[in-house]
From Swiss-Prot:
Signal peptide: 1-21
SUPFAM superfamilies in the cross-refs: Spermadhesin, CUB domain (SSF49854)
InterPro entries with a match to the protein in the record: CUB_dom, Sperma_CUB_dom_sf
Disulfide bridge partners, by residue number: 30-51, 75-96
Keyword Ribosomal protein attached: no
Keyword set includes Signal: yes
Organism: Homo sapiens
Top-rank taxon: Eukaryota
CUB domain location: 30-132
Keywords: Disulfide bond, Signal
Pfam families: CUB
Name the UniProt record assigns to this protein: CUB domain-containing protein
């Protein structure tokens, strides 16, 4: 589920200022399986062209993904995809441009995939994830 931008921007600002490090991921990670209640995913600048991050919270919890800004992405050469569940699940969105966008999982798992063409250098991005305290099953 995608949240409207009018509501998302103030919420993201409040989250970004109240949720501070330590975050679960590091800029050099190309994928991984994370179980922390919140974290931040950075772009990967190494030779791999596809990275997959699986975020798995406790059963009954909903994962919220916040993408503050994707700018500078070359659409057609790189994108971020948000999957509603483990790899292979339904895609919530495949994006190459975004500003203040939120996604919610329908279960306790969400997958973030970054893909780029081998000849294209990676563009900086950061994505936040956290447990949605208001939307548990």
């Amino acid at each position: 589920m995608r949240l409207s931008r009018a509501f998302a921007w103030p919420l993201l600002c409040s989250i970004a200022t109240t949720v501070k490090a330590p975050f679960a991921t590091a800029p050099s990670d190309c994928g991984g399986h994370y179980t922390d209640e919140y974290g931040r995913i950075f772009n990967y600048a190494g030779p791999k062209t596809e990275c997959v991050w699986i975020i798995e919270l406790n059963p009954g919890e909903i994962v919220t993904v916040a993408i503050p800004d994707l700018k500078g992405f070359a659409c057609g050469k790189e994108y971020v995809e948000v999957l509603d569940g483990p790899p292979g699940s339904e895609s919530l969105d495949r994006i190459c441009k975004a500003f203040s966008t939120f996604y919610y999982s329908s279960s306790n798992i969400i997958t973030i995939k970054y893909s780029r063409e081998p000849s294209h250098p990676p563009t900086f991005f950061e994505i936040y994830y956290f447990v949605d305290a208001w939307s548990t099953h």
